[in-house]
Amino acid sequence: MMQPKLLDKRKQKEVQYYLPDKEMSQKLANFFALFADKTRLRVISALSISEMCVNDLACVLDTNQTTISHQLQLLRNYGLVTYTRQGKTVFYKLATAKINQVMLSGVEYLGF
């Protein structure tokens, strides 16, 4: 059986140069895993439209507050959402429009 021909050395070095290192690969995997939960996706979608508090998100998404709070905590831990406090109410928003762009890229890819 013949061995498959490997890339030429120049191409191999080029590919290796542009590949993310193991640490970056892990960070990317963790980042994209945040989009692998339907509740988090819906939270991101809602926050791309308007800044909202937990109660409003729970109402709009027809999900209990505990679930929403848990998902927001994960999104906060990874820096996808930020918050401001107004009295006793905490309002959440996307940290950057790029978060919504990532999701919209997925929507576009799927042809919706």
Language model features by range: what are they?
Residues E23-T66, V90-A97:
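N-terminal helix-turn-helix DNA-binding core of bacterial DNA-binding proteins
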Residues E51-M52, R76, V107-L110:
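Residue-level detector of secondary-structure transition/capping positions
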Residues D21, L80, F112:
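Hydrophobic patch in the ABC ATPase nucleotide-binding domain
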Residues Q71:
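Residues within the DNA-recognition helix of helix-turn-helix
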